[in-house]
């Protein structure tokens, strides 16, 4: 059972500008809660929050809490895992005896308030929850949405809908998703990651089992071997076979810019649809979203038109612009499996001659920023294998995400291993983002697809190129 959230109780977010925190703040302010927050950065998100009525201060000091207390407010104070116990705001809030909620406590409370779909899994959570939200919006359901990315049809990561359903992204990185009790839990896949939190794959599997145990119903991807072995859902979906599964979306034609597929329920064909997204992984994400909507009783006929409107969230194969004849694409891929799938999709655009760009790209220049020293060390061989699938490769320095450096773990180490596996691949390692930008300028060619991947600040490449 989640912690009770009283109507119109004031709430203060430490780090309100984060993608997960800002989504919650938008929901609460729309529902009448006095909402405030702090974030040291001045960003478009903080400006948007202020326009919605959230009080935002751009510092994190004890004075922020003192001001709230002097105004007679004793807010619930919300923190994420990223906020250290040494944070001065958090220390003062504890000293004042204020209620301290983890972000997951607040999300759990909102999930409990209405029929909810919680989307979990190692990869594809944001895309699948975005596609689920889009299908429900296009079907006239107007769901509440709390997503870890910008949903194109909403222009936001948080939406306080007026329909009966809530769609939430359930992040497994810190294990807090076990607090959620949704009506439907959707699990996209499972693979070892977040080794800074989990002791190993078994630990991660046990956490996902606990999440599944807390759901009224579970929908899972049968194409994932780990889920197939360790999870017992109420329903399966697949994109490889319609046999033995409750839902399937089988590809009839895969192109560099779209996919024609046939949807099945209990082995029987229901209808064909055109998915305006390339890649088998995107078809799987869409199949999971379709299956979830069907389990919530939405007729396929009301969903099929929405399929043509599907767009991925921000930073998921996101065309930022064209620079001197090069297509600059930003993607959040930061795990070897994500990198492998994203590069395969990009190569399909090059080889098939079909792409979402004005003309098909002729070469693939991959740019990768490793995320966390611990992840780079754990998956060095897998990254080296995945990153070979390009015509030229540029590596940015490891984005630490607050971690201390590890001896011998750096982008040059990764480059050396890739070169051993593929000696003829052109590779360069940048010293910083400015150097990376210069390398893109000098090593790319007209009609190149420049694909920047990573969960850090590598998305700063496009502003530097276009400046």
UniProtKB/Swiss-Prot annotation:
It comes from the Bacteria. GO terms for cellular component: cytoplasm. ATP binds at residues 121-127. Pathway: Cell wall biogenesis; peptidoglycan biosynthesis. Disulfide bonds: none annotated. The keyword Cell division applies. Belongs to the MurCDEF family. PANTHER family: UDP-N-ACETYLMURAMATE--L-ALANINE LIGASE (PTHR43445:SF3), UDP-N-ACETYLMURAMATE--L-ALANINE LIGASE-RELATED (PTHR43445). This is UDP-N-acetylmuramate--L-alanine ligase. The lineage of its organism: Bacteria, Bacillati, Cyanobacteriota, Cyanophyceae, Synechococcales. The gene is murC.
């Amino acid at each position: 059972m989640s912690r009770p959230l009283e109507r119109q109780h004031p709430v203060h977010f430490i780090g309100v500008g984060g993608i997960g925190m800002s989504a919650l703040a938008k929901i609460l302010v729309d529902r009448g809660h006095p909402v405030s927050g702090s974030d040291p950065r001045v960003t478009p998100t903080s400006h948007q929050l202020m326009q919605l009525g959230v009080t935002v201060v751009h510092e994190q000091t004890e004075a922020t809490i003192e001001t709230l207390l002097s105004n007679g407010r004793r807010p619930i104070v919300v923190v994420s895992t990223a906020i250290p116990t040494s944070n001065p705001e958090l220390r003062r809030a504890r000293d004042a005896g204020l209620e301290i909620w983890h972000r997951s406590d607040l999300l759990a409370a909102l999930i409990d308030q209405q029929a909810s779909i919680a989307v979990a899994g190692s990869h594809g959570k944001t895309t699948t929850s975005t596609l689920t939200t889009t299908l429900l919006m296009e079907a006239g359901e107007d769901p509440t949405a709390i997503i870890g990315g910008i949903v194109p049809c909403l222009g936001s990561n948080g939406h306080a809908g007026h329909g009966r359903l809530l769609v939430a992204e359930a992040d497994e990185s810190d294990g807090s998703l076990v607090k959620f009790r949704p009506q439907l839990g959707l699990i996209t896949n499972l693979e070892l990651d977040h080794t800074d939190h989990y002791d190993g794959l078994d630990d991660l599997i046990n956490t996902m089992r606990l999440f599944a145990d807390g759901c009224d119903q579970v929908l899972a991807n049968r194409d994932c071997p780990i889920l197939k072995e360790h999870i017992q859902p109420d329903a399966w979906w697949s994109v490889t076979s319609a046999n033995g599964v409750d839902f399937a979306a089988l590809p009839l034609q895969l192109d560099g810019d779209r996919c024609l597929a046939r949807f099945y329920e209990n082995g029987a064909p229901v209808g064909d649809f055109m998915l305006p997204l390339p890649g088998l992984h995107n078809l799987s994400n869409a199949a999971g979203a379709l299956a979830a909507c069907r389990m919530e009783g939405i007729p396929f006929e009301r969903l099929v038109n929405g399929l043509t409107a599907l767009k991925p969230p921000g930073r998921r194969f996101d065309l930022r612009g064209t620079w001197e004849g090069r297509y600059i694409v930003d993607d959040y891929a930061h795990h070897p499996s994500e990198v492998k799938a994203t590069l395969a999709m990009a190569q399909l655009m090059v080889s098939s001659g079909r792409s979402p760009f004005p003309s098909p790209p002729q070469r693939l220049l991959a740019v990768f920023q490793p995320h966390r020293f611990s992840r780079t060390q754990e998956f060095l061989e897998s990254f080296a294998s995945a990153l070979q699938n390009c015509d030229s490769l540029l590596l940015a320095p490891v984005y630490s995400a607050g971690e201390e450096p590890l001896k011998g773990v750096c982008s040059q180490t990764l480059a050396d291993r890739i070169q051993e596996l593929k000696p003829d691949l052109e590779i360069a390692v940048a010293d910083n983002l400015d150097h990376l930008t210069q390398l893109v300028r000098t090593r790319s060619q007209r009609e190149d697809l420049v694909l920047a991947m990573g969960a850090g600040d590598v998305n700063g490449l496009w502003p530097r190129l276009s400046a």
